[in-house]
Amino acid sequence: MASAGLYRRVLPSPPAIDFASPEGKKIFVEALGQGTMEGFFKLVSYYQTQSEPAYCGLATLTVVLNALSIDPGRKWKGPWRWFDDSMLDCCEPLEKIKVQGITFGKVACLARCNGAHVEAFRSNESTVSDFRDRVISCCSSEDRHLIVSYHRSGLKQTGEGHFSPIGGYHAERDMVLILDVTRYKYPPHWVPLTLLWDAMNTIDRATGLQRGYMIISKLKRAPSILYTVSCRHEGWSSVAKFLTENVPLLLKSEDLKDIQEVLSVVFKSPPSELREFITWIAEVRRQEDGNLTLSEEEKGRLAIKADILEQIRTTTLFKHVTSWLDSQRSRCRTIAKLQDRDMLPELAAGVCCQGACLLTGCCLPGGKCCSQIDVKHLNVDHKNIVTLVSGTVASGSSSEQGVDVLVPLCQMGPEGHCIGMHPSTADVLTVLLLALPLHTWSGIKEEKLCAEVTSLLTTENLPPLLQEEVRFSLETVLF
């Protein structure tokens, strides 16, 4: 016997005003004249209904990412790269979200993981006046959009926690337009800003933290040039917990005497996924008729990567990390989790396979879709040498596609061999340490050692490019 089901809900009005009602249209026209509906048209062009009852956070973010014209870097269907809520899986398993929904922090994490700039404010970190100012700023722009996390009961609606984008603002009435992504339940509607603030100023029982709002915009450059936190890796959350929660406790419990002992606490018994947590970004391109030349844009990007890598290697922290790794070489088991994929051919095979997935749709695990891995060294400008790793991808039953992986740096050794061809374990661990909050080290008992560690890990004196790399990694870890 079929169940009756539900067909929509009556929008509680007041306090809400249906966007399509005569009064809702009047408010829209007035707000349009005030210049606070500028973001509406981009948002409504990509406005969609969430595909699952608990996907409000994913659908909201999908609307905003598409409105900002952010390239997801992977295919949706056919040849098309496009954000769909089923693709936002890098911070929380979709099966878990489908049952439990998603929290404020994880939505912010998803936005960052997918290439957006995020400014997140929980209600206890802001005021209603701050919120109003930011609503006006975002609604007066096409380039910044505001997402709200609120409890529906505050608007006399059925349901609990919910996410939606804000589509506009009316100054005289002090009302905001909520583009509700549960369009099967409620239509877009205007609500008083202060009432929405009260609905945001509530506790999410899943985390014990306040709800809030976040501003999403497009990054002016790639989120990271050389390194990225691998939040798509299934073990990333356990690694983040180890680094931000366990490490501070371990440091407090040990009587440490020098930097080497501090590094041992952090790296001797890490989670098995640590080696995958921060990875270097390689550039992948299709092979074009055996063309081995680089475009000016490719040369520029590789030069920046080489600069950042050089900046890492000139830090005192890098020297300490290198010394610690050298001291552990004879204990292979100790550092196996950190170095099991440090050889360029193995790394390149994995990157080649990821590139193949992006460029051809061939997505096989473990680098199995790439064959005939070949390493070449190209003179870029008679001074700098770039490493080019080529592979062949079987993209169909009989067709093949050549794929090139551009490696950031190649230095020639005394015998003419290429050395230091890619970011090493020492480079990655250095960036990882720099990305941790300074309060991580505050529990070190020996005051002089604590001061020395803090000095080593302070980022304010780093070169700007390296600061930006570290800042992005830090923000991702904290979310």
From Swiss-Prot:
Q: What's its catalytic activity? A: [Glu(-Cys)](n)-Gly + glutathione + H(+) = [Glu(-Cys)](n+1)-Gly + glycine
- Induction of the gene: By cadmium.
Q: Which GO terms describe its biological process?
A: cellular detoxification of cadmium ion; detoxification of copper ion; phytochelatin biosynthetic process
Does the keyword field hold Mitochondrion?
no
Q: Which residues form the active site?
A: C56, H162, D180
Gene Ontology MF terms in the entry: glutathione gamma-glutamylcysteinyltransferase activity; metal ion binding
One Pfam family in the UniProt entry:
Phytochelatin_C
Name the Enzyme Commission number(s) assigned to this protein: 2.3.2.15
Organ and tissue specificity: Expressed in roots, nodules and leaves.
Q: Which UniProt keywords apply?
A: Acyltransferase, Cadmium, Metal-binding, Transferase
Q: How is its activity regulated?
A: Requires cadmium for activity.
Residues forming the Peptidase C83 domain are 1-221
Q: Which residues cross the membrane?
A: none
Summary of the function given for this chain in its UniProt record: Involved in the synthesis of phytochelatins (PC) and homophytochelatins (hPC), the heavy-metal-binding peptides of plants.
Protein family: Belongs to the phytochelatin synthase family.
Q: From the Swiss-Prot or TrEMBL record, give the protein name.
A: Glutathione gamma-glutamylcysteinyltransferase 3
